[in-house]
């Protein structure tokens, strides 16, 4: 890994004085200086320094600035600051959903949600209607016996019903968890069976790419394999009747009932998100009502600069943390856009059309989509009215320099471009958007407030201007409270704290520049990350190796220099098998059916074998490093593998590919 340049270039974009003055983070800094001793001068760098040095005071200020309603007061901000195990706002009780629906009191007839399908015609839902539906469904969940701590699951696309179900679950103190309906049954069960849901919200199918996709057989399999279910709720997106024994959605949201918000401890679970499952079952990551509330208020209200006048559109699905992040836009009183459809239907410019028709002020997408638009010769600034868009944000992978230039040239010059980076693990950003700072090509603007983000070398020494491991040295409120089914905390500890005890190590290569920006170089582990969605290699192995022709397989994901992502599947065939067009088609079909279209590899390549550790584990990271151009002797410890000749094969393959 080479050292990244840190000399600041001329900014691609610089906010003008008026924009800096009216930004929420500027007003917050002035208020915090008056009330909490924050530095009045020095702009964002001084505020960030104060936020990590005076961590408790900073988070107290966030709670006060956003008027967080504690139904019982907290004893102190941070009872225990050790990682893992930080104890935030002990003694406090509150409810996330109550805060998400607060705008209904003052602006009942304004738009809370804009639902957009592949017709690209927005359908509004007011704050009053959203609150009413949440109140009705919450009462029905209580009638079904859902109690605080019970898990409620959704097999749903990005539709208003999913938001209502999440908020109603949070209102009663339940724990929400969701998967997108393009997940196959096995992928869903690997997640939901861990948390044992008592209610399952499902659709009969969904529309994507101009086609209807019937999921009733998958839903039937989920019902059969989830014995803890007390109720299944049918949402007829394709117009089919509810199957036997299922409740109909319309009847559950028909009442005019004021929501009752269960007041739960700050650390009470809000939802379960899932890791990719690279080394087995996905990790079931539990985040708290209070932790998500204050972290998302900070991130969306200060960093993204969202408020009641804004419209927030991020292309996502319910299987990605960005959906949860998107829903939290409601906390700031913002109108949230829910786009349920293909990112490229009927053409590559689809997302820009949605941004235009919804009047989006902050539009978020993947870096891969930006680069696809550039390659497809899309001209969003010419072909769409994007005058409302203040910021285009990207995540999922680092936005390449050409992506910055393309957005600047093809949307407009006065455009805030926010490349952001975080993780499912915290459901937030470690670094990214700051409305008062300049944007430099290829760089994230700065580390987030309250986040002591550093780059460490292997010895644990902080480095500037050099590539190192992304670490966070102080606790964040949205860090997991625990993993599900991890009673001694060992899996949680090993995931983040094994390399540097007491310090969060995330698994990204980064450079922190001497002007405070951040450059992301990609994953330092082998997690697959395609279009912003982290996926597990274990899921792919399980599906592919059911085919009798496949002896073993290996899948690798590589970030390309041009911003692309190459995901080859290497297959070691059974004796007598041939990798012909028929077998390739069956491999692809198996992956599509059992997992999702996103899991389908870019290439399927026959290999003489799959290398392993001495304990029999497939070697992924060394193969990835070989494909990235790392010499064999630096990519792997020769004494730790079962067949060094196999690794020489992959090294030769990499050399051939590079030409």
List the model feature ranges, each with a label:
Residues 234, 593-618, 631-657:
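AMP-binding/adenylate-forming catalytic domain of the ANL superfamily
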Residues 293-311, 321-361, 376-377:
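Conserved AMP-binding/adenylation subdomain of ANL enzymes
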Residues 154, 179-204, 219, 344, ...:
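AMP-binding/adenylate-forming catalytic core of the ANL superfamily
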Residues 157, 199-218, 239, 340-344, ...:
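Adenylate-forming
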Residues 302, 339, 390-517, 523-527, ...:
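Conserved AMP-binding/adenylate-forming
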Residues 109-111, 234, 245-274, 281, ...:
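Conserved pre-ATP/AMP-binding loop-to-beta segment of ANL
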Residues 167, 171-251, 358, 366-367:
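Structural core segment of the AMP-binding/adenylate-forming
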Residues 46-50, 97, 113-167, 184-189, ...:
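Conserved AMP-binding/adenylate-forming core of the ANL superfamily
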